Amino acid sequence: MKKMLLIAVAMIFVAGIASAASIVDSKHDMRTHITNETNTEVCVYCHTPHQQGTSQYPLWNHTLSAAGSYGAYTSPTLNGTISPVPNSNDGSVTSLCMSCHDGTVAVNALFNPPNVGTLGSAYTAALDGTGKIVSAANLGTDLRNDHPVNLDYQSSITNGDSGLNSAASVSSLLIGGQVTCASCHQVHDPAIVPFLRVTNTGSTLCLTCHIK
């Protein structure tokens, strides 16, 4: 009986963890930022099962930014090749993230709204009166002061950067061999603020790639 009770408690504990790590009610649940929202869908602010607005994955539903070049971080010690961050319909992970995070497009600007008239128009302090991000999550349209993205990881090693772990050891974090926003951030899991893949306590996240 005692054993069964312990198992039940453990299951409740695990379920609690799973719930806490859900995108529902997280900062990526856009319903929490729109005060008169009557839409009940969570995923719709990024994804749609039909009539996607881009020609590539992942069934993207959010209007892409029309911003020009975002620029890229440069440094005398940077050996890798950085590709321009596109804002076209190519499905680039970084361009999808920036469609909200460059602060030029409202978070509820969708290609395929769930139901006409269900998206609210009053926003919380994280958004301005037009639904654009104004908090620290607004990275702006200049990425030259941010960690490099669209960086070819292997090219850094090939060109002599001995301060990086092997590309094979971090392959699960790379998309098309590149470092992107999603290399550090897990957009669907708010368990580790701010949506980090692993904790950065003791620089754990940084040391996943960097040898220091």
Question: Predicted segments — roles?
Answer:
Residues 1-4:
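Positively charged n-region of N-terminal signal peptides that target proteins for export
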Residues 6, 12, 16-44, 48-212:
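C-type cytochrome heme-c attachment and multiheme electron-transfer modules
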